[in-house]
Amino acid sequence: MFRAKQIFSTLLIVILVSGSVLAPANAVERVPRLPLLSTPQRGDLAIIVHKSNPVQNLTMAELRQYFLAERNHWSTQQKTRVAMREPGAPERDAVLRLICGMNRDQDFTTYFLRAKFSEQVIDEPRNLDSSADMIKFVANVSGAIGYVRADEVDPSVRVIKVDNLAPGDPGYKLTLH
């Protein structure tokens, strides 16, 4: 009888341990830090602005104008300050392709060099090294606009809709894919 209890106890321990060992290390589900209207899909980019900015929605054409410095003031007459991720970041590549209509970072750099030389643009976008830096910049600069992966948004900034769609909505176009 003692032997049966010992085998049963050992078997139970093996089952319990193997269940936790076989579970992936990243099995904990990551929950967005800021509640959005929809559940963002992995790879959705969120356009973020300073919390005081009253803008709720921008069209893709308006976003393009802001990111290319063709518009440099919000409707409140607040000066805009565009933030971009560093060259080579997948988020930056997606913004260049989907918002700016450019396939290479070099096209973006050339665009701003020409615009600055012809005095059409005074302020170039601010390049930031990480999503944390992007959020911090946008949270601290009242006219700032930037972007991060939707699952990285925190309550210090506000997500705006693009073409009346939020990250996670069906048909949302700003994705890394």
Features from the language model and the residues they span:
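Sec/Tat signal peptide C-region and signal peptidase I cleavage site
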Residues: 22-27
